């Protein structure tokens, strides 16, 4: 209570209250506000010199006390323009003249920024350096240019004239800042009197004209274009001109004036016009101005969006409707256009004189009516339009086609219409002599004429010619369009440049052979059915049962894969007799053929081609004939293959992350201290539990194995604090970052590439292994899932279908996010980024954060982490993602989503920096219980529903992308999946990548 009274008294200059509090001993240096400003700060800001003297001299409060941002009372005096307080603090209170706060701002910077010329003059006279820079590289001259005070600017340029063209760390010069703030008189002074360079650009490529146009400073734009040599076609790094910036900001007068001054309509680097920018931001007047200058509203940017599309996407329905209405052609009555120059009669007269002069009376020439229409008989256009032709957008492409014809017509040249010429006119185009000067027989000439006639689309030969003459006239136009072999290209070329190479022909031949083979197989289908019926009638019932249910056949114990069937004869050749199953009487050789036939047909009909390797079966004993190194773990080549499939470089990641000299406990070879329960070390790390023995070749665990993956060497409560941790705990944070990068990188790569490419490669490898046949029968081969395992296999197919459908939905969603939205988010300077900002807008606004589903959250984070984030923010976002996915199984999606929101809100409000960590928030949401809270089967806690029927797009083999883009909203949350199922998949995937990280970063130790 007394502290609050002291602050109020200092602001109001209440000396009586201050004396009473001083006598009571209540005036202490620790009395500050929320920003760390003390009593002397508040008295100085208010301009109460007597209070300042009382607090410093009698209450003995420090005159140079710093707030949280490092500002002293001297900074407050300079900012508020209190010269008397500033003089006393510097001369009598022991404050420094050039004290800088945490940003490097000095009193001279603040005096110039807030336009106090008396303080600027006094500080310069007292010896304050005009060359002092802030951490951003700003001089006091830059701050004066922002303030707009001409006197301050003149004082500072006189003190430091060489700083006129000096730029800050972002590339801003004093002239750029003056134009950005709209100070015309300062810009004129800098250019005329100080010689400032108008061609200087910021780091993003923006010039002074761009800055003035972007902020709507009309007079400054006109002055720059009129009285400086700055160009109207100047572009920034993204190809935007001053028209783009004016349209983006909705500055219609500037837009109209620039167009009247001759500014061309140009596309930016991504194909956008100023109309795109105006429509995107809903500036209808700018759209109207651009349309009045004949900008084409149907132009598309590189994303395929028109201005109407962008207006609808951002929720500007009125602007979109206006663009639609203005784009419709309106029929109006028009008078006939004026005659061309020269007039048609004069043109016809000139042509006739030239014909007489040449003396070519025997050659029939085109009439004037064919070349140029006669003006009096010119018809009225059928559908005249109200708007003229759209203004052409400046592109580097050359003029083509109709534009060239229109230009020639305007120049008075008649366009030669070859398709309207009679056959006699084409006769002149065929020479009478060949290249050697020998005469060409007339019948050959006529053949050439008719070929040319057919090629140019002229009429057929006269009907009075007989059939033989027509046959001699050469091939028709349809015959001319056949494909031909080109010696130059060594390929077959089509009439439009189509290319058919030898490889294409080989592929087509193979396809034809496959079709022929399929036809022959269909012919034998009925015969196979008849033979199968005979076998069932002749053979005893148990034998039929044995051939269908191949688990009754002897097989190699411990190996369960799907690559090839296990035959009885093969087992007899490779195993001892005692290794067979207890049922184990060896069957005759011919039974193996029946088993192979039934199994091959089952695989063919069921479609089981290598996708059932995720069968969740307990590990079986490893065959004794395998080497010990196979049992101990994967070979080096096998591990390297798996690492390549992960898409990461282990050595690079380790070099980037592991800087500390010590290794974590999970990687140490020595045992932990005695007395600690298994799995935990005294240093706080949770070691990896013994992993179950899997495939003898050390392959990756299948989809079923990941469900029971345990916490691999790290717990969610591993470190009490990220800030100020020791080397061991820093390594724990690095492990968290690695896990998150592997986890998110895997999902991102799967979403941005063809779905499940690795599984397809494995399927191809399995098919090749099966095609090798008997030569691989010497070693025990794992068996495929039997046809009787259909329900479990269908469950695996259903899981695969859900993931495929999820990835396809992600691709469909990202296809509807304009690239300009992602670019502008990546350049955003203020406020923290959030995943929903990177998703398609719903009704013109981003998706509400509280309605985000887990899959949309991940999709947004993929793009968020692509932005150019500061190093500390990127690190803490990785750690934040780790906590989100780590606690997903135990607390549910709603809880971890609220936790993420709480952390980002704290940072956005300025109450917390990224480097401060978030352990207190984590304890508030998830508690502070020690030990790994990981559940072996987190799906049970989530209450996962049984897998139901999938949408059509999610079935394997169908296209992963839905035909209609999903609509994001709070009702469906942009997802057609069960929320619990998706959380279960993501949770188990995160557990798998924790295991994978432990395996990968233990490689080669």
Swiss-Prot record:
Query: Which ranges does the UniProt record give for the ANK repeats?
Result: 1-31, 35-64, 69-99, 103-132, 136-166, 170-200, 204-234, 238-267, 270-299, 303-332
What is the protein's known function? Answer: Binds to but does not cross-link actin. Required for the formation and maintenance of inner ear hair cell stereocilia and staircase formation. Essential for normal hearing.
Matching InterPro entries, A to Z?
A: Ankyrin_rpt, Ankyrin_rpt-contain_sf, Espin/Espin-like
Q: What are the GO cellular component annotations?
A: cytosol; stereocilium tip
Q: What keywords were assigned to this record?
A: Actin-binding, ANK repeat, Cell projection, Coiled coil, Hearing, Repeat
One MF annotation (Gene Ontology) recorded for this entry: actin filament binding
**Its encoding gene is what?**
Espnl
Q: What is this protein called?
A: Espin-like protein
**Any Pfam family matching the protein:** Ank_2
